[in-house]
Amino acid sequence: MNYEVKKLEKSAVEVKLHLTAEEVKPIVDKVLAHVGEHAEVAGFRKGHAPKEVLMTNYKDHIESDVANDAINANFPEIVDKEKLEPVSYVRLKEINLKDDLNLTFDIDVYPQFELGNYKGLEAEKKSFEMTDDLLKEELEIMVRNHAKLEEVEDAGYKAQLDDTVDLAFEGFMDGAPFPGGKAESHLLKLGSKSFIDNFEEQLVGYTKGQEGEITVKFPAEYHAAELAGKPAQFKVKINAIKKLRQPELNDDFAKELGYASLDELKAKTKEETTKRENDRIENEYVSALLDKLMETTTIDVPVSMVQAEIQNRLKELEYQLSMQGFKMDDYLKMMGGNVETFAAQLAPAAEKKVKIDLILDRIAKDNNFEATDEELNQRMEEIAKMYGMDVPALEEELKKNKNLENFKASVKYDIVMKKAIDEVVKNAK
């Protein structure tokens, strides 16, 4: 085996691999034997086609398999000799198979970089003070979040913006109903812009039981092409009008939330708000320190690592949307984009995240930080508690999905990264 390794930009390397006829022959014979077992060639019984015929009929397939087998057999030695740390799959660029084999491929490797000085970094760290006004604001939010819709009993009451109506409707286009344009009982908050055009505003002033007809125009970019940009008429009927009624802030309200009294609720709210705000301030401070460190650390980030981070973010968004009953494509269409455009928008933040992870990983390695069994067990207990279970139950659940070891590895990684962050903070001015 002969090879050459050439450094490319973005922490990629190009490898030119040469195998002599003697070295590549066993690989070719093995691939031909496998292809020959399954190949169906006119004029020959299955499994009896000559090698020359197979090479002609299945040239691309055979060359690809030979190349992959050759890389799998020889690349580990190259990695070891050149001290490479691959972070992506091999990308084949050129295959030249005759008697001998010449391959050209590239692969992303863990970037080599000089870490900037993280000792003595400076960043502003704000302070937090809990005030009566902030407590009042937090309690008001809590009350609003526990407001309930109650039907308006006054038969003459006219619907207003911010009211919620129980609505029956049927849509027509050119006098004919269209699919998906009918409902017998749909809750709609007026002014929420949930419906197209000025549909909601036209319902202002309606009373319970009132029927009518409104005209709207579908937006030009509407997801259903057959409706996009066209006018439509809706027959409507108000089944009921509802208003949000907020509970009174008193002991009874506190007890509904599981507290002994309003005073206890206030004390707990102060405590939780103080922790939340101090955590936010700490996160902003750490982020500012890491931004400073990034300014003094040049890293040629591999494209594959950025793409992997983008994919992680897309999967997380897809999961969150599925929990709300949305499909990713439909959501992005409503936002005026698609997966490709959204991925491009995510790229700068994804690259920054990868850079920070690489910096923290280097700090962790330089300081020999590791996650102890005790730290892992403690974190597993905290996670289990979040899900309302004990550690054995959590581990059993993870085993069902064959994800226990990966999960523990991820937890260990987070522990080590936290130690690296603490090291940066400890050494800041």
From Swiss-Prot:
Lineage top rank: taxon: Bacteria
Annotated keywords = Cell cycle, Cell division, Chaperone, Cytoplasm, Isomerase, Rotamase
A Pfam family cross-referenced in the UniProt record is Trigger_C
Question: What protein name is recorded for this chain?
Answer: Trigger factor
- As recorded in Swiss-Prot or TrEMBL, the protein's gene is named tig
Q: Which organism is it from?
A: Fusobacterium nucleatum subsp. nucleatum (strain ATCC 25586 / DSM 15643 / BCRC 10681 / CIP 101130 / JCM 8532 / KCTC 2640 / LMG 13131 / VPI 4355)
Q: Where is each PPIase FKBP-type domain found?
A: 162-247
Q: Which InterPro entries match?
A: PPIase_dom_sf, PPIase_FKBP_dom, Trig_fac, Trigger_fac_C, Trigger_fac_C_sf, Trigger_fac_ribosome-bd_bac, Trigger_fac_ribosome-bd_sf, Trigger_fact/SurA_dom_sf
| Top enzyme class | isomerase
- Please state where this protein is localized: Cytoplasm
GO MF terms listed in the record are: peptidyl-prolyl cis-trans isomerase activity; protein folding chaperone; ribosome binding
